[in-house]
């Protein structure tokens, strides 16, 4: 995809956080969009990997990248401050991996929509494996790369409050990878911002941040592709 196409595509999309209220409610189990091959599945058990790597904000999603450290979008973290709370892999009213306080927020200095958030190690509300954040979550590892045609999955909390913090997994093909941009055909909604974009081995290729406004067979979703520079920034800001 050339830069002009990327710019035009980005101009036509909207950032989907639950603050906007844009989007439609997910079906209970599986939804398919014929040509785009978009599949959305409700996650039944969030206490197994890769779901133990995902966390919920009040209005969006994040995921674990290291000790006491999660990743989300800048447009998500700007609505939070030190002392606010995140919940590790909640599963509606069936429990979660604990509730934790934010202790530090570090935004990526470039244009990419990436923000590192460090949390207090000890839970405000314990998870199934005690009060330690790192005992209740599983950090993701990076993929070697990604290319057009490969299948990816986006795991997150669309309309988290409306859907009672039920986790959903959406799959589809990669359309293009260029620089720090990855475009894919996977159904995402308000609240999916900050979701991990994973390959078939559940390895990180990027972070979701937006989707086209249109809701048809040609609707694409957009993520930040993890370049060496972005990986370096994340590594330097993992809690010690």
UniProtKB/Swiss-Prot annotation:
Active site: 75, 113, 193
Entry keyword set: Hydrolase, Protease, Secreted, Serine protease, Signal
SUPFAM superfamilies, per the entry: Trypsin-like serine proteases
Signal sequence segment: 1-36
MF-aspect GO terms: serine-type endopeptidase activity
Domain of life: Bacteria
Protein name (database record): Serine protease SplB
Source species of the chain: Staphylococcus aureus (strain MSSA476)
Gene: splB
């Amino acid at each position: 995809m050339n830069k002009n196409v990327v710019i035009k595509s980005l101009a036509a999309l909207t950032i989907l956080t639950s603050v906007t209220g844009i989007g439609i409610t997910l079906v209970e189990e599986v939804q398919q969009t014929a040509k785009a091959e978009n599949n959305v599945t409700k996650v039944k058990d969030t206490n197994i990997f890769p779901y133990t790597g995902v966390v919920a904000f009040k209005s969006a999603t994040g995921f674990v990248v290291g000790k006491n450290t999660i990743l989300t979008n800048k447009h998500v973290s700007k609505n939070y401050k030190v002392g606010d709370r995140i919940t590790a892999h909640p599963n509606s009213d069936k429990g979660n991996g604990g509730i934790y306080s934010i202790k530090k927020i570090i935004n990526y200095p470039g244009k990419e929509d990436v923000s590192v958030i460090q949390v207090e190690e000890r839970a405000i509300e314990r998870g199934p494996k005690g009060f330690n954040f790192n005992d209740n979550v599983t950090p993701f590892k990076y993929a070697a790369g990604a290319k057009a045609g490969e299948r990816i999955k986006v795991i997150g909390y669309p309309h988290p409050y409306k859907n009672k913090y039920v986790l959903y997994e959406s799959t589809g093909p990669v359309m293009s990878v260029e620089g720090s941009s990855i475009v894919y055909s996977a159904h995402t909604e308000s609240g999916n911002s900050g979701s991990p974009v994973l390959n078939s081995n559940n390895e990180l290729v990027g972070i979701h941040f937006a989707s086209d406004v249109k809701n048809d067979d040609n609707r694409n979703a957009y993520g930040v592709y993890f370049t060496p520079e972005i990986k370096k920034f994340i590594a330097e800001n993992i809690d010690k």
